[in-house]
Amino acid sequence: MTRPTTQIFDAAATARLMPYAALVDALRRASIDYAQQRIVSPERLVVPLNAGGIMLSMPATAPDLAIHKLVNVCASNGARHLPTIHGQVMAFDADTGETLFVLDGPTVTGRRTAAMSMLGIAAFAARTPREFLLIGTGTQALNHLEAIGELFPDALVWVKGSAPARAEAFCAEQSGKVRELRPLAEAGATIPASIEVVITLTTSKQPVYDEPARAERLVIGVGAFTPQMVEIGATTIGGSALFVDDEAGAKHEAGDFIQAGVDWARVGGIAAVLGKAQPVLGGPVVFKSVGCAAWDLAACRVARDALARG
């Protein structure tokens, strides 16, 4: 019997298969599925590559779909003028094990990560936000800007970079993705009080945001993914209710919380809020996402459904 050729999608085609609104809905479902053990997503396997690079193996299975993300992270690629991350996400039939399609790994990761932040806004923001601050000017900042542009088209987005020139360049290059895009162009500039959502998107090893906690401002940490990294300082964390996307992974990867010495008994999972098992009482919130393969499975569900519609 002749088997059909497996479809392989590049970065642009992968992005077209997963609009942010659909990703947020899929992540809402997957968060609850994962918490209720309807998705199996073991801790990622990490093996070394040359020059400090790493290979990450991240499988996940559900009754309707199985996926495996394999990505390589090579920090030394900048000197080679190559992307830091390469990889693929493969989707499989959960009954037969046959390969269904292959997606671009960095694109899946970037888009589902931004969509998880948008789900965090839906779960924890006091009201529909109109003003955002993105701290960081890399790929994840771009993914988040695109997500905000799709889901909050009337928003004003501020950008803070590691240097004022970086924020200015980012805003100039990405003009038009949201209604209004402004750099925080002065070093040490005061963060406007009107900002309702702050999203940190760096690989910093010292806090890039440590303001007193405010009930009307949601803080979302994305970039720090090892115990050595920290973006959100102890002042903000100490005054906030704390939530994560993946409770198991966060204990090993959420550097912000680890370095602040948080009591993990007071850290909740987003699934409990989405499932109404744990109410949010209206005070300040920090939501930290670390990611897991269950979220890649959610993205593959979106792609599968898009392909089925043709």
Where on the chain are the PLM-derived regions?
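N-terminal ligand-binding/catalytic initiation module
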Residues: 1-109, 118, 125-128, 294-297, ...
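Short helix-loop-beta connector
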Residues: 124-131, 153, 215
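Glycine-rich Rossmann-fold phosphate-binding loop(s) that bind the pyrophosphate
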Residues: 137-138
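N-terminal Rossmann-fold NAD(P) dinucleotide-binding loop
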Residues: 141-142
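Aromatic pocket-lining residues of Rossmann-like dinucleotide-binding sites
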Residues: 148
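NAD(P)-binding Rossmann-fold cofactor-contacting core
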Residues: 151-174
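Rossmann-like adenosine-cofactor binding region
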Residues: 177-257
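Adenosine-phosphate binding glycine-rich loop
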Residues: 228-310
